[in-house]
Amino acid sequence: MTTAVQSFLGNNYKTYIVLFLCALIIGIKLGTLVPLLSLILESRGYSNTEIGLNVVAQPLAVILFVRVTPIIIHKIGLAKSIIIAQIFTIILYFTFPIFDTLTSWFIIRFIIGFAGALAWNAFDTWMLSMADDTNRGKIVTIYNTVFVIGFALGPMVLYMTGIEGWLPFVVISALSFAAIIPLVTMEIDDPKLPDKKTLPVLATIIAAPTIFGAAILCGLDDVMFVSFFPIFMIKNQFAQEIALQYVTITLVGGVICQPIIGVMLDKFNKRTLMNSAVIITFICPIIFSFYLDNFYVMAVSCF
């Protein structure tokens, strides 16, 4: 078994397994946190605009600190960056029930966004620094798939914990703690990073505007969907539990389609596939909204 895994992932297979496990746990945590906060704010009577502005706090921090996180990672190393970021988020998750105003939540989510960007950049850098041309594609595919699986499980965790009281925040904090246990207890190599000058952000955007734009839109679509879809369902007289189940159906569709899309990318024009995906993403929510009384159409549209 070990030989087969090593043959598939390469000599750094132990490190990859640890990072995949951490990505799974963090995916579960984020898949729980994002809809949790939106549902709590909606239950308190905040408008969609106020909820949306609150949601934006985390990605806003990622954008503003895009040049800062690589400096920190080079200073203290990859493993320490992930551990410190997760410890910060553990503390911050417990502040949500204490400071429950909209402004305080914006500040908390902004700081969590910075910590999340630090951890995620460290994960990506670690993963790609070990990969080479022989295994980079499969490593990135597994990494993304594992994270999406975790993200898909998040709404189910929320289904079990509910949105009331401290319990959901305790569970999310426990998941953050679980993510750092393998990094602390297992002997894995923290690779030495080369001293390379990073490209200016503007130059990167100019070099690949389509990819950059697609990444921004996909990230925005994912966050807004998980944040607002449960609210939309509840306002259309669906139970909270049912709303979360439809979110999971959508995310499971993303997991199942990952390898299919990977095969299609090798056989068809990439830009055509991307444009097709955009059209499907645009049409399916419209179809969904017209068939709220038909489970099969709703499920297929979400998937």
Predicted regions and their residues:
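Residue-level signature of mid-helix packing/kink "hotspots" within the transmembrane helices
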Residues: 59-67, 151-152, 251-259
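Helix-loop boundary and gating motifs at the non-cytosolic
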Residues: 10-59, 210-211, 219-233, 243
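Helix-breaking motifs and short loop linkers at transmembrane-helix boundaries and internal kinks
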Residues: 77, 98-103, 269, 291-293
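Helix-to-loop junctions at the C-terminal end of transmembrane segments
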Residues: 65-77, 162, 258-269
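Structural signature of the two symmetry-related core transmembrane helices
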Residues: 80-94, 272-287
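Paired small-residue
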Residues: 103-111, 296-302
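C-terminal membrane-cytosol helix-exit motif in multi-pass small-molecule transporters
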Residues: 173-192
